[in-house]
Amino acid sequence: PERARRFLGKKHPLPVVPANARNVRSVVRAARGCHLLVNASPAKFNESALRAALRLRAHYLDLSANLGRNPFKAEQLGYAKRFAQKRRAAVINAGVAPGLTNLLVARSAELLDRMDTVHIRLYESTVGDTAVSQWSAEGLFDEAVSRPRVFRDGRFRLAPRFSERERFRFPAPIGAVSVVLAAQDEVATLPYHLPLRHLDVKIGGNEIDRLRRWYRQGKLRPSRGMVAARFPGTLTPRQVARLIRCGKLQNARLAVAVLAGGTRKDLPVEIRWDVSFPTLYQIRMRGLGVTPIAYATAQMAALFVRYFPRQLRGVFAPEALPAETRRQVLNAARTRGFAITRKLRQGKRSLDEEW
């Protein structure tokens, strides 16, 4: 409760109730009377939150998957029948990556007669004199020590950590950067809902470069645990503002690119989506002390809540939502400061469009 108050501020009217996220009964007591349970805790608590939502007969939404039992299938999908029996809906992985990326892949599938390949590329960077976690330290550590999941030739595989390095060009002002395979959750849902042959996710930026360097130095091993010096806790808005004022944190940036390849009218087609988000500086100018990843994830979660499909029954990844719901969320994302651009190439023809 104390940490939550530091995020919200002492005068915020939102009630803060303590709960043990590992204990289903504790979550049920804290959330009694709610209609929608939003789980923004680390993914290792997903199943406790899912069971609590079922006991409460509440709808459910979360931001990521744990993949502890099956590295290739989101554990939340196993609760589909139970949510259907309770006549409730669960929307999972409803953030930016996964979340927004899934919506863009699904939109690409609508534009193509057949979609074969999907490449998702992410960029995360900070400019400053101190190490800052743009998102959950637990999530960053889990991604750093987990083997990346890929979908190749219609089969799931585990790839070596930080492998398949390549140069990828993001729109200005980022430009060309090195990207490597990452353990992202999109691979654990997209192949189950869309006919694909190839899918991978790579990340670039100085944060992933730092993790890759530590890995090559032998400093990233699950047995060694999470070292606080390398994986600092998530900063409160007040701490972010203090670092900016002191000049220790100048800026931070997040970008997403989704490339989908397939055919339309028997011709090869490539669709590219680029999404740029408000930078740390731009967010600070709005009076908010949060990082770009935290801001973008919170905005996407809010949009999924706003357009929550209460009429559905079961568990749904973003790409499995009704087309109208997906379009509403994508259109609303643009009003939150997300610049979404689509480029379509068919043969020698190229067309640039603002979403």
Where are each of the predicted segments found?
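NAD(P)-binding Rossmann-fold cofactor-contacting core
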Residues: 1-7
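Short acidic/histidine-rich motifs immediately flanking catalytic phosphotransfer sites
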Residues: 11-12, 31-36, 55-56
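Conserved Rossmann-fold cofactor-binding substructure of NAD(P)-dependent oxidoreductases
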Residues: 18-36, 40, 45
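ADP-ribose/adenylate-binding Rossmann-like module
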Residues: 42, 52-74
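Rossmann-fold NAD(P)-binding glycine/threonine-rich loop
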Residues: 64-90
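Adenosine-phosphate binding glycine-rich loop
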Residues: 82, 86-125
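C-terminal catalytic/substrate-binding lobe primarily of soluble NAD(P)-dependent oxidoreductases
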Residues: 110-355
